[in-house]
């Protein structure tokens, strides 16, 4: 490739971290939630590794349902998710999963991701 001699797909973030620790890889992209959960619960999984950079803040991964889901069901799902993050009964669960809120997002909220992709392509990073 243009930037690395080889690209490998480990199959999981945890395996990518192992590959780094075993010096089978030079760099890996690990999502911030996985990284934070490992820092909190299994710091040994990050032993000997250093974060060399962070991507800009972006909306989280979308929650997806079937396109044919009725509007009433969508509303019920959204209400349930909002209750989950608002109800004290679920606070410890949300804290454990690093969930601090829920909000409906439009497709436009994800536009910065496409802009970053386009910016990278303009700099010559369209694929590794």
Predicted regions and their residues:
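Short helix-initiation/N-cap motifs at beta->coil->alpha
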Residues: 1-18, 57-59
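Periplasmic-binding protein-like
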Residues: 43-81, 95-114
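Ligand-binding cleft/hinge of the Venus flytrap
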Residues: 1-9, 37-44, 118-119
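Generic secondary-structure signature for well-ordered alpha-helical cores
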Residues: 82-86
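A ligand-binding cleft/hinge motif common to bilobed small-molecule-binding domains
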Residues: 19-21, 26-46
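Tryptophan-rich aromatic "cage" segments
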Residues: 116-128
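Histidine- and/or cysteine-centered catalytic micro-motif in compact active-site loops
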Residues: 12-13, 32-35, 54
């Amino acid at each position: 490739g243009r930037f690395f001699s080889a690209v490998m797909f480990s199959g999981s973030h945890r395996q990518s971290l192992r590959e780094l620790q075993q010096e089978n890889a030079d760099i890996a992209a690990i999502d911030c939630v996985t990284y934070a959960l490992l820092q909190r619960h299994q710091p040994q999984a990050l032993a000997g590794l250093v974060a060399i950079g962070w991507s800009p803040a972006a909306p989280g991964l979308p929650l997806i349902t079937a396109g044919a889901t009725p509007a009433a069901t969508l509303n019920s799902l959204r209400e349930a998710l909002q209750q989950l993050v608002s109800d004290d009964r679920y606070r410890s669960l949300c804290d454990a999963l690093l969930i601090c809120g829920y909000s409906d997002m439009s497709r436009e909220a994800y536009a910065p991701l496409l802009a970053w992709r386009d910016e990278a392509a303009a700099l010559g990073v369209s694929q590794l």
